[in-house]
C-alpha cells in the first residue's frame, strides 16, 4: 500500500495523551505502521554513562501509530489523504481542499 504520510509532513495527533498537538514527522516505519513525530509522545529513557555520552534521564520521542495521525492541510485543519493521477504521475492530495500535498 502506498504511504499516505511521509517524512517531513506536518501532522496532528488524533488520539492519546498528545491529542490535538501538531508536529513534523521525522521518520516513518511502514513495516510496523508507526511514525516518530518531533516533540510528541515523549518518554524518558534511562541511559548508562559511557565515554562519549553522558548518562542519565534522556527524553526521547516514541513512535505513534499512523492511524492516530492526520495530515494538516493548508487551512490548518486535519485531513485525510487520497491519491490521484496527474500528468501520468500518482500524487497525494488533501481530501478537504483537493490540493496536491
UniProtKB/Swiss-Prot annotation:
CC per GO annotation: ribonucleoprotein complex; ribosome
SMART domains, A to Z: KOW
Gene Ontology MF, one: rRNA binding
Assigned keywords, A-Z: Ribonucleoprotein, Ribosomal protein, RNA-binding, rRNA-binding
Keyword Methyltransferase among UniProt keywords: no
Coiled-coil annotated residue ranges, if any: none
UniProt-listed CDD domains: KOW_RPL26
Biological process (GO), any one: translation
Pfam families: KOW, ribosomal_L24
Assembly and oligomerization: Part of the 50S ribosomal subunit.
Function, in words: One of two assembly initiator proteins, it binds directly to the 5'-end of the 23S rRNA, where it nucleates assembly of the 50S subunit.
Family: Belongs to the universal ribosomal protein uL24 family.
Protein name (database record): Large ribosomal subunit protein uL24
